[in-house]
Amino acid sequence: FVFRPRFSYGKTDNTNGQNSYTFSQDPGYTTDELFGTDDLTSLVSEEDIINTVLKNTLKKGDDLTVGGSVLVNRRLGKLGRNITFRGKYNYTNSSSEQFSTSETEYFQKTPEERMEILNRYITTPTKSYDYSARLTYSEPIFTGGFLQFSYNFQYKHSTTDNSTFDMGDNWTIGDGVNESNPGVLNNDLSKSAAYNYYNHQMDVTFRWIREKMRLNAGVSFQPQKSDLSYKKGDLDTTTVRNVFNFTPTFDFRYNFSKTSQLRLRYRGQASQPNMVDLLPISDNTDPLNIQNGNPGLKPTFTNELRAEYNFFNTEKQRGMFSFFRYQNIMNNISDRKVYDPETGGYVTTPENINGNWNLTGMVGTNIALRNKKYTINTFTRANYQNMVSYISEKDL
């Protein structure tokens, strides 16, 4: 019987200042020259200036997490027959406040739309908890052979209530928010969400243990259900998603000797898109970084193969270790950004994309000199990544 409690508390308080200019082409001046002038148009023509942004932000937050885990194992008579229970629970209570002032001048818009002042106060309290229970049973079927059955249930719940307040044009961060200056609630930008996640996982694993060999092969079945209640402006929706994940696993280990070993592993894993990303919504809290949802997103599936080999000669004090990994991701989720030449901002939409894979290999050696008082160590590593993203004349 093992019990491990968990407790953590964190507090944040940071400020950030941003001063940026966006041009349609290279302005031909250094950063110091551009930011040092009182009249930007004296250096660059208005036709080449997209926007100028002056922004200051203060963020405050605190985070409290408590939880624990328990492990109970009991042997049931016959050698190799046992039952194990694992349980976990976590609770998190966090809150954040953001005070921001922003002054953006759009040089390519009409005089009425040219200047945009956004002074805002945003508060985001969040509460979440999750728990899981896993029961595992192992049954010997022949000498060195075992069948292992396990069932795991996991539940997650979280609530977030984001309230955005518009402050006056002359408001500063130092003024704060109080009864005399409460701000005006912006219903179009404020949002709340309640999320529930249910996961049932059934695993069947075959284990074969010999003097020089160990083999684990199995499959995992995961029926999942998620529901999201989301409110933002006039949108009030509840989305329910039911999925079924199938995950194969393979782990083979062979000992050529006590100091030489080969290991091969494979795992496939499916992951689902974020529920908010599946909603047909557009979040323009930041006018220069508009976030869109995409109801057509597909699940992502990752294949990973690993190989390891090492040996060591104790008499000659020489050894080698090597590692190889291949990973490819099907239907990877990537952000597609579309540039708006009038504002200098971006509209971001998550979309599926294929063609992402990577290879990693490494080899290390340890060679002792003749007197064995000195050794020469080498380490070689190679990595290749094939990364695919959306890019064109206007998309980035």
Predicted stretch roles:
Residues 1-396:
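Primarily recognizes Gram-negative and organellar outer-membrane beta-barrels
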